[in-house]
């Protein structure tokens, strides 16, 4: 990585381990510069779903809660409900799912802070690191 220090260009290595199986600009920006992005959040959430086989949002939400070694209810709980067009209500409980759903289905009545995005990304990183690399 190159950095500009008052007009002097320096190179430095990124020593943080990557989480995702392929290099993405979102992950590189997070590891190198600490840049939070919805892209990285979605990449992590999708990777977690695929690697755990929890392909529905609800099953992934339940999986996240069950990871009690990393899931801290005080930090990571964000309860909300969603009613589908047929009138069925689904209740979700985790911050990562809350943010995932707002990214996927923007809603002007709800939002999240940069602190919540950071907290959610950090949890998703920990959960993804638990997964086998095959």
Residue positions per predicted region:
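Charge-enriched, short contiguous segments at helix-coil
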Residues: 80-134
């Amino acid at each position: 990585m190159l950095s500009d220090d008052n007009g002097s260009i320096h190179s430095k290595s990124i020593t943080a381990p990557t989480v995702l199986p392929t290099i993405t600009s979102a992950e590189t920006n997070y590891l190198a510069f600490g840049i939070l992005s919805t892209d990285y959040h979605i990449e992590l959430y999708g990777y977690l779903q695929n690697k755990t086989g929890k392909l529905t949002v609800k099953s992934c939400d339940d999986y996240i809660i069950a990871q009690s070694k990393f899931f801290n209810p005080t930090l990571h709980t964000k309860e909300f409900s969603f009613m589908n067009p047929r009138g069925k209500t689904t209740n979700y409980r985790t911050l990562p799912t809350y943010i995932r759903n707002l990214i996927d289905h923007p809603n002007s009545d709800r939002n999240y802070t940069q602190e919540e995005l950071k907290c959610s990304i950090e949890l998703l990183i920990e959960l993804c690191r638990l997964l086998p690399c095959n």
